[in-house]
């Protein structure tokens, strides 16, 4: 599937490449759903994890309820996975696994309503995810919004929700940011370049570093 975060032999460059493959086609989708999950790692339902993660339930419960220490004070964890926990990325991936399948079942089916690999993706719905960052492509804004609602239902079962402010539908001609890169079409040509936010962060790091070394 097209999930690239915290997986062996996969990285952000692979996710960017998949976006390029999808968006550079001559009949590429024009609409993008930019997904943003509110505090994904902090709000995953413990009940859902204990019911669906295939591992020893007692060990998993101890890990989830271990809490964290900050300034010598113990803070309990009633939801989410411990920040910095060694298996937290795996649990997050397993929680979000299934979004792509849900979209395929809805948009990649044949006339009989069954998933068919030979069926042409007329809706141009594609899914790319890196950890809790994801984008969905679509042929129309209406299809993108339909995909948004399917994902919202999927996340709700797991104690998660989309940010309405940051989850937006964008036309490829206006461009969108994903994993530190900006994707936009100019005169039918796809241009991928570092996002303004990423460039600003790099410039800030350089300006902070050079004065210190000059002292």
Describe the function of each predicted region.
Residues 2-175:
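Conserved polymerase palm-domain catalytic core
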Residues 158-215:
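A conserved non-catalytic segment of reverse transcriptases
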């Amino acid at each position: 599937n097209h999930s690239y975060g915290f997986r062996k032999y996969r990285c952000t460059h692979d996710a960017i490449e998949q976006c390029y493959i999808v968006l550079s086609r001559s009949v590429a989708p024009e609409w993008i759903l930019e997904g943003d999950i509110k505090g994904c790692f902090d709000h995953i339902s413990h009940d859902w994890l204990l019911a669906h993660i295939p591992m020893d339930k007692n060990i998993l419960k101890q890990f989830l309820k271990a809490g964290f220490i900050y300034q010598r004070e113990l803070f309990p964890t009633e939801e989410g996975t411990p920040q910095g926990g060694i298996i937290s990325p795996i649990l997050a991936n397993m929680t979000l696994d299934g979004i792509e399948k849900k979209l395929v079942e809805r948009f990649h089916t044949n006339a009989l309503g069954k998933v068919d690999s030979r069926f042409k993706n007329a809706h141009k719905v594609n899914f790319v995810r890196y950890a809790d960052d994801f984008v969905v492509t679509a042929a129309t804004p209406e299809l993108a919004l339909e995909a948004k609602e399917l994902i919202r239902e999927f996340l709700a079962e797991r104690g998660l929700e989309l940010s309405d402010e940051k989850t937006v539908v964008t036309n490829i001609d206006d461009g969108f940011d994903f994993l530190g890169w900006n994707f936009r079409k100019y005169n039918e040509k796809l241009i991928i370049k570092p996002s303004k936010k990423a460039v600003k962060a790099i410039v800030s790091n350089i300006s902070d570093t050079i004065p210190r070394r000059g002292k």
